[in-house]
């Protein structure tokens, strides 16, 4: 799992350090336990970070004490964010949750747009339905990470379609497999087009690894 963690951290670090400039105001949605705080620190940005899981927020806030001059961590998501306008909003491994239903998708994208200045960026890493659905309906990589999906998800591309995910390591999956909504990039691009232009949609890791890393895509949208 160390190799997997390094791959994922490297991909996140590259995006963060490439797309965020010193002095930028950034919102990190789905910050988890604050494992990326040092990556944000390297950019010199002012960071707001949030997560819907209160246990994760508590740990992130403890980690963030040393960064208190430039970092604010709160419980929630973009829908209960303040009136601050950001240079960028990031969703690393968390955007799939706005695909819970049509209302959540639409309201989340609208709120993201309202909190980004014109020309600002909406970016991150997301499990990509186009990379998941070609896999066997129950697929396990050599590290024991497992994904399950049904054929219904292939033929009915819509919000609310779910997969079952179990990572063999990591506190989020400590109690077992978790259902997660599927992110369909065509739906996302279409719904976001009212406010954003797509700049990039590529594999998180360019080479095929045979690991769960292969299901993730990097995305960058620019606010119009």
Could you describe each region identified by the protein language model?
Residues 5-22, 39:
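Conserved alpha-helix/loop element of class I SAM-dependent methyltransferases that forms part
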Residues 23-32:
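Conserved class I S-adenosyl-L-methionine
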Residues 34-78:
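Class I SAM-dependent methyltransferase SAM/SAH-binding core
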Residues 81-89:
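A short acidic, Gly/Pro-enriched loop at the edge of an enzyme's catalytic core
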Residues 92-95:
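Residues lining the SAM
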Residues 104-118:
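A short glycine-rich, Lys/Arg-flanked "PGG" loop and its adjoining helix->strand segment in the class I
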Residues 123-190:
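SAM-dependent methyltransferase
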Residues 166-224:
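C-terminal lobe and adjacent flexible extensions of AdoMet/dcAdoMet transferase-like proteins
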């Amino acid at each position: 799992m160390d190799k997997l963690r390094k791959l994922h951290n490297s991909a996140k670090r590259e995006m963060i350090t490439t797309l965020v400039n010193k002095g930028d105001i950034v919102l990190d949605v789905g910050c988890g336990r604050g494992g990326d705080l040092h990556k944000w620190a390297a950019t010199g940005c002012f960071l707001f970070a949030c997560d819907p899981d209160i246990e994760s927020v508590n740990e992130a806030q403890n980690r963030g004490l040393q960064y208190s001059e430039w970092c604010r961590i709160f419980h929630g998501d973009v829908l209960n964010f303040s009136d601050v306008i950001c240079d960028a909003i990031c969703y690393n491994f968390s955007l799939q949750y706005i695909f819970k239903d049509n209302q959540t998708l639409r309201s989340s994208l609208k709120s993201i747009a309202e909190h980004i200045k014109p020309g600002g960026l909406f970016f991150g890493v997301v499990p990509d339905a186009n990379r998941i659905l070609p896999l066997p309906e129950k697929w396990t990589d050599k590290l024991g990470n497992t994904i399950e999906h049904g054929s219904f998800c292939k033929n009915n591309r819509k919000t609310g379609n779910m997969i079952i995910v179990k990572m063999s390591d990591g506190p989020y999956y400590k109690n077992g497999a978790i259902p997660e909504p599927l992110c369909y990039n065509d739906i996302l691009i279409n719904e976001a087009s009212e406010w954003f232009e797509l700049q990039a949609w590529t594999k998180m890791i360019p080479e095929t690894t045979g690991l769960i890393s292969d299901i993730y895509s990097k995305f960058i949208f620019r606010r119009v």
